[in-house]
């Protein structure tokens, strides 16, 4: 339910962009994101930091896109957010005792320390890769292709990365947790 709720603003953005253009799509994205955050707060009692970062970025860059009727600002949102996620993971990897991934999931899953470091580094590289691909597509291909990529390409890449992560984690789970 929670993951589905996170994709509703993106799907609405895609549909409104295709039907009415960037200004209406940006406004729709902002409103849908704010509603999504309110629902998450009411249903789960809190808004996670990642959701707060994404929501703030949507409101900021989406407002600029709506005001100037220009998609470029939302293109930069994706680049900035993925760069920020990658940087945060890298800083946690090398600057703190535990990588961020371990801090987030370590209570639910018991894994060797080096596995946590590999996962953290893997996701940092993934976000960096998403940032670079987004940067290329946003600058060298059409706006329509970028919207398609943002809606379906990044979603597909994220699902694949999540699946690979799950398979990787499974190999290192204690036998009792594998069942």
From Swiss-Prot:
Q: Which InterPro entries match?
A: YciB (IPR006008)
- TM helices/strands, residue ranges: 11-31, 52-69, 71-91, 121-141, 149-169
Which keywords appear in this protein's UniProt record, sorted alphabetically?
A: Cell inner membrane, Cell membrane, Membrane, Transmembrane, Transmembrane helix
| Chief location | membrane
Q: Which GO terms describe its cellular component?
A: plasma membrane
State one Pfam family annotation: IspA
Where is this protein found? Answer: Cell inner membrane
Hydrolase listed as a keyword: no
- What does the UniProt record say this protein does? Plays a role in cell envelope biogenesis, maintenance of cell envelope integrity and membrane homeostasis.
UniProt lists the family membership as follows:
Belongs to the YciB family.
Protein name stated in the entry: Inner membrane-spanning protein YciB
